[in-house]
Amino acid sequence: MTKATQILQRFITLFLPIFLFPLFGCSSNNATDPAVVKAVAKEAYIFAYPMLENYKTMQAQALSGDSFNSFTHATHLQGPEYRDIVRPNNDTLYSTLWMDLRAEPLVVQIPSVTDRYYSFQMVDMYTHNFAYAGTRTTGTGARTFMVAGPNWKGTTPENVEDLFVSEGNFVLCLGRTAVNSDVAGDLERVLEIQQQYRVQPLSAYLGQTPPAPSSMNVFPPYEKDKAESVEFINLFNFLLGQVVIDPSEKEMIQRFGLIGIGPGYLFDASRLDDSVRNAMEEGIAEALEEIKNSGPLLGTEENAWTLTKRIFGNREQMQGQYLVRAGAAAMGIYGNDLEEAYYPSTQQDMHGAPLDASGGKSYALIFSREDLPRVKENGFWSITMYDLPDQFMVENPINRYSLGDRTN
C-alpha cells in the first residue's frame, strides 16, 4: 500500500456524527423557503471560503506529510515550480510551521537577526493574522515566544517573552527571511539562520512529561469539486469544531444552522429536497462569483495600478469584512498586514490595455532615483511578475523572477 493510499484511507474514514443535521428537524417555513435558503447558503459560503482555502493548504503541506509542529525550510528562492500558495515572493526564504495546539502550546526560539528583514506571521483558522514576531514587531534580538490554542489554561514560563493565543487548534506560523541573491554566500547565511529557528512543545521545553495527545487524528479531505458545492458544509462543520466561535459571530453561526451548519454537525446532502439543494447551489454560485469580482473592495485604482486596502489583519481589523477576507484569500492567501508589507499590483499598461508579452511586446517600469520605494531599516522592495489567471511566477531563459533594491 502506497503512502498516498494510506493518507486517502485515513481521510475517507472521516469523523462520526456529533449532532443530527438540523435542517430536517426544523419546523420553520424558512427551512424550505428557497429565497431564504439561498441567502443563507451564500452568506455562509463567503464566511467559510478563507477557512476552506486555509485547510486546503494545510492538507497539502502538513496533513499529507504529517509534518505538524516542525519547521519546513525552503532552501532556495521560489520560482515557477512553486505552486502551493498564489503570488509567492522571490525575496525571502520561507520557513513553514504548521502548529497542532490541541494537546499543548508550542515554544519557538529565534536567534538574533540584525542584518536583514525577517518575520514570523501567525495565521489562525479564520485566516486572521493574529500575531507577528520579527524585525518590525519584536526587534532584531534573540526572542522566545509561545503559541497556545484557545482551550489552554496554564502559566507562561518566565523566559518566554511573548504569548500568542489562537482562536483555533491549528495555526500557520509562516517565517520569511530576506535573501540578497546578488551577494555571494548570502543564501548560505540565511540557511544557517534557519537552522537556529527552533520549536518545541511546552512540555519538552520545560523538561516535563507531555500531556496525552488528542484522540482525534482523522481529517476530512479537501476536494475542490465538493468544496464548491453543498458538500462544503461537511468540511466547514469540521473546521467550526476546531475553533472558538467569537461572541460577535455566534448568532450568525446559529442562523447558518438553517442549512445544516454548526460545529461538528453531520451533513448529509442526499437528504436534501431538490428545491432546497438547488437554492443552496445557487447561493454558493453567487458567493463564488462575488468573491471572484471582489477586486474593488480589495484596492483602489490609480494610474493603472491597484493600491491595496487593508485586506489582511487581526480579528479586530477584519471584523465583519467577510467578503474582503474571502476575496483576499482568493487573490493571495496569507498576505501580510499593511504595517508589515504593501502589495500594489497591475495587470495593464498606462493606456489600460492588458499586459501581454506573448506577441513580442516589451514594457518598461521607470523610477527616478527620488521616487524609488522607501522602506524602513532592514526592509526591502521588489517587483515580481506572475502569470494569469494562476498567479504563479513565469519561467524565463535568464531565471530572473523579481527586481528590487538588492538587484545589481
Predicted ranges, named:
Residues 2-15:
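Bacterial N-terminal signal peptides that target proteins for export
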Residues 19-20, 53:
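Alpha-helical transmembrane segments and their juxtamembrane interfaces
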Residues 28-408:
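A compositional/structural signature for long, glycine/proline-rich flexible linkers
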